[in-house]
Regions:
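Long, compositionally biased stretches
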Residues: 468-547, 551-608, 616, 621-639
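Extended, highly charged linker/hinge segments and catalytic-adjacent loops that couple domains
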Residues: 290-294
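Cofactor-pocket helix-loop regions in the catalytic cores of large enzyme subunits
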Residues: 1-275, 282, 296-482, 492, ...
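Flexible, surface-exposed loop regions and adjacent strand-edge segments
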Residues: 283-288
C-alpha cells in the first residue's frame, strides 16, 4: 500500500464503477457496526448506481431469525423490551453464551432472577456465564459468590433444538398450558400444527434432541406454569440447515401460551453487532420491499431496481464466476467472517477492485482485488466535527431502541473522514462520471440531521427522528406484534408453521462440529489467546471433545488431529488442531470461529435464509500422525 489523496481514492472508485458493464457487477457489503446514517447513505449509493447487491453480516448470523419471524409474526425482529426480563416468570436462553458474547444481558438476567424468574440454559455446552454471575461494578458481588443464573441446564444435541421444542409443544398440548382465547383470536394454522405434534413420536423427539423425555416434560411443566415466558437465542440456532424451521417451532411453542404481546413475554433474538438490526431497518437489504423502494424514490428521487441482489454467500459465488468485479466493504472483515475461507479469498482476489472502509487493520486488507484501497474512517468513539458543528450518529439495539452515539476522543489522525463523509465523497465522484443524481451529498456529509430527515421520510416509525433521538434513552420503533398484537403476515394473524423434525445426521465415523467464540474475542477481532470461562489458555486451534469420544478414538488431551468436513461429496481439510476434553454431548465437537471457517462449505446453507451452516458441519477426525502415515503410504505406493 502507498498513501494517496482522498480525491484520488474517490476518483479510482468512481472510474471503476462507471466502467462496469452492469451495475450488478458491484457489491456493497455492510458490517453491523455501521451507523443508521452511514448505512442509509451506503444503500442509497448502491441503488443510485443501480444495484441491490447489499450483503451484510446479518446474512451470516441472524438472517434465519428475520426470515422465520417475518413469516410467523409479521416482523423480522424480536418482541421483547429490556424491562420485560424483570417481569417474566420463565426465561429460556437457547444457543447463546451471554457471558462472552452479550455480557450486558447477564445484568438483565440477574435482575430477572432477583424479581423471581426462573432461567433455563439450553445449549450443548453449559457455559460458565450461565452458571453464576458476579457484576464487575458491584464490589460485594466481586468478593462474594455472585448470582446463580441458570436454574436448569438442558444439554441438547447440536441442532437438536427443533425436536426439543416439538417435545415441549407436545407436552404442553397434552396438559393445561394452552391459551385458546389467544389462539382463536390472533393465530392461524393451529389445527394443522396440533396434528403434526400428535404425529411426532417421543422416540423421534428424544433421538433427535438428545434430551430424555422426563427432562423435556419437566421443562414443559415449567412453561405451563409460567404466565410470561421469554425465549432468547443467538447463533446457536441460526446457523443450521433447518434454522428457519427451528425458530418457527420456538414461535409455535410460545404462541400456544399466548406469550407474545404482553409484559414479560416474547421472542428475543439477541444480535451481536451494535447496529446490525438498525442497518436492515434503514435499507441494507438485498431483498428490499417494493414499498421501501417506492418510498425511497419519493424521498430522494433515486430510481432503484426491483430485482433482488446478492447476499453474502451469493456474492462470493458471483465473484468466483466473474459476475461481480468490484467489492466495497463498509467496515467488517469479510474474508475472515465468511464460510469456506479459501473460496472467499479467491473470490475477492478475482475482483478488479476491493475497497475497505475501516477503523483498524484486518485480514481483509491483505486478501484483496487487483487494485485495493483502504479508506480509514473515524471510529464511533472519536469526535466527528464538520463545518456544521459537532455531529452524532444513531443505532438500533436488539430491543428496537434507537439511540444516539457520539464520540469524545481526539481522532487518531487529522486525515480521517467519517463514514457518511466517505460515502458522500464516493457519490460525488460517481455523479461526476455518470450524471447528477439530484442528491445533496455534500450537505449530507456535514449535517447528519439532514440524513435523519431523509430516513424519517423514507422509513416508517422514525417520526420526529431528530427530536426523539436526542432524548437520553432514545426511542422505541413500532413493533406491531408487541405493541398491539397486530401481525402483518399473509393471513393477518400469527402463523403456526409446520415442519418435519430434522437434525444434522452425520455418517458413521463423523462428528457434528459447531464453531464458537472465545471470551477474549469480539466477532472476528481476537484480543487474546485465552478463553478464561472455558479454562483454555494460550490456544485457539483447539477441538473440544467429550471424554467418551476421546476414549473411543484412543486420543488424549493435547493430541494433534486433522479435521475434514464433508458436504455433498466435497471435502475441506484443516491440519493440526489440539484436542481438549470438554463437557459436550457425545458425537459433537466445538472449534473456534473464525479459525474453523475454512471447514464450513460455501454451499452448505440454511433453507430459506441462505445463512452458512457454521453450527452444523459434518467432520471426520484423524490424528495428524495417522494422516501423515496414510499420506506416506500413498506416496510410496504411487512411487
Amino acid at each position: 500500500y502507498e498513501p494517496i489523496s482522498w480525491d484520488s481514492a474517490f476518483g479510482i472508485i468512481a472510474e471503476q464503477l462507471s466502467e462496469l458493464d452492469n451495475p450488478d457487477e458491484a457489491i456493497f457489503y455492510t458490517s453491523g457496526r455501521t451507523s443508521n446514517e452511514a448505512a442509509f447513505l451506503w444503500q442509497l449509493l448502491a441503488r443510485r448506481l443501480g444495484t441491490n447487491n447489499l450483503p451484510d453480516c446479518s446474512n451470516m448470523c441472524h438472517e434465519s431469525s428475520g426470515v422465520a419471524l417475518g413469516d410467523s409474526i409479521g416482523i423480522g425482529k424480536g418482541t421483547v423490551k429490556l424491562e420485560d426480563f424483570s417481569k417474566a416468570d420463565l426465561i429460556l436462553v437457547v444457543g447463546q453464551n451471554p457471558g462472552s458474547n452479550h455480557p450486558r444481558m447477564l445484568s438483565a438476567l440477574k435482575a430477572a432472577k432477583v424479581a423471581g424468574a426462573s432461567v433455563v440454559s439450553i445449549n450443548p455446552l453449559f457455559e460458565t456465564g450461565m452458571r453464576r454471575f458476579k457484576h464487575p461494578q458491584d464490589p460485594l458481588e466481586v468478593i462474594g459468590q455472585g448470582t446463580t443464573i441458570a436454574d436448569m441446564h438442558v444439554p441438547v444435541n447440536v441442532n437438536g433444538d427443533l425436536a426439543l421444542f416439538r417435545g415441549l409443544s407436545k407436552s404442553i398440548i397434552s396438559g393445561s398450558g394452552i391459551d385458546y382465547n389467544f389462539i382463536s383470536k390472533y393465530t392461524s394454522g393451529y389445527d394443522e400444527y396440533e396434528r403434526a405434534v400428535a404425529d411426532s413420536s417421543w422416540d423421534e423427539i428424544v433421538s433427535a434432541s438428545g434430551v430424555a423425555r422426563h427432562d423435556i416434560e419437566k421443562l414443559a411443566a415449567a412453561m405451563r406454569a409460567s404466565s410470561s415466558t421469554i425465549v432468547c437465542w443467538a447463533m446457536g440456532l441460526t446457523q443450521h440447515h433447518n434454522s428457519v424451521a427451528t425458530i418457527q417451532e420456538i414461535a409455535n411453542t410460545l404462541l400456544l401460551g399466548g406469550h407474545i404481546g404482553r409484559p414479560g413475554a416474547g421472542l428475543c433474538p439477541v444480535r451481536g453487532h451494535s447496529n446490525v438490526q438498525g442497518d436492515r431497518t434503514v435499507g441494507i437489504n438485498h431483498k428490499p420491499s417494493r414499498g421501501f423502494l417506492d418510498s425511497l424514490r419519493n424521498t430522494t428521487g433515486i430510481e432503484s431496481p426491483f430485482n433482488h441482489g446478492y447476499d453474502s454467500v451469493n456474492s462470493v459465488l458471483a465473484m468466483l464466476d466473474g459476475r461481480a468485479k468490484v467489492f466495497l466493504s463498509m467496515g467488517g472483515n469479510f474474508v475472515s467472517a465468511m464460510s469456506d475461507t479459501d473460496s472467499t479469498s479467491r473470490a475477492i482476489q478475482s475482483c478488479d477492485l476491493s475497497v475497505q472502509i475501516s477503523t483498524k487493520p484486518n485480514r481483509s486488507h491483505l486478501v484483496t482485488g487487483k487494485t485495493a484501497l483502504i479508506l480509514p474512517c473515524l471510529g464511533r468513539t472519536e469526535r466527528d466535527v464538520t463545518s456544521e458543528g459537532y455531529q452524532f450518529v444513531s443505532v438500533e439495539n436488539s430491543m428496537g431502541v434507537v439511540h444516539s452515539s457520539q464520540g469524545s476522543s481526539k481522532p487518531a489522525s487529522k486525515h480521517l473522514k467519517s463514514e457518511p463523509a466517505i460515502v458522500a465523497g464516493m457519490a460525488v465522484a460517481l455523479d461526476g462520471k455518470i450524471g447528477d443524481s439530484g442528491v445533496s451529498w455534500s450537505k449530507l456529509s456535514v449535517d447528519y440531521d439532514s440524513i435523519r430527515n431523509l430516513i424519517e421520510s423514507a422509513v416508517p416509525g422514525f417520526d420526529s427522528y431528530n427530536e426523539r433521538v436526542r432524548e437520553p434513552q432514545g426511542f422505541y420503533l413500532p413493533n406491531p406484534p408487541r405493541d398491539d398484537r397486530c401481525f402483518n403476515t399473509d393471513t393477518g394473524r400469527a402463523n403456526f408453521r409446520v415442519h418435519p423434525i430434522t437434525a444434522t445426521s452425520p455418517d458413521d465415523g463423523q462428528f457434528v462440529m459447531m464453531t464458537i467464540r472465545s471470551h477474549d474475542q469480539y466477532n472476528t477481532t481476537i484480543y487474546g489467546l485465552d478463553d478464561r470461562y472455558r479454562g483454555i489458555k494460550e490456544a485457539r486451534r483447539v477441538v473440544m471433545m467429550c471424554k467418551e469420544d476421546m476414549n473411543r478414538l484412543g486420543i488424549k488431551t493435547g493430541t494433534l488431529v486433522d479435521l475434514t468436513s464433508h458436504f455433498e461429496g466435497d471435502e475441506l481439510t484443516a491440519h493440526r488442531w489440539r484436542v481438549v476434553e470438554y463437557d459436550i454431548p457425545a458425537g459433537n465437537i466445538a472449534t473456534y470461529f473464525p479459525e474453523a471457517n475454512c471447514l464450513v462449505p460455501l454451499n452448505s446453507v440454511a433453507e430459506g435464509s441462505n445463512t452458512p451452516t457454521s453450527k452444523s458441519v459434518c467432520v471426520t477426525v484423524r490424528t495428524t500422525e495417522e494422516n501423515m502415515r496414510f499420506w506416506n503410504r500413498t506416496a510410496t505406493q504411487a512411487a
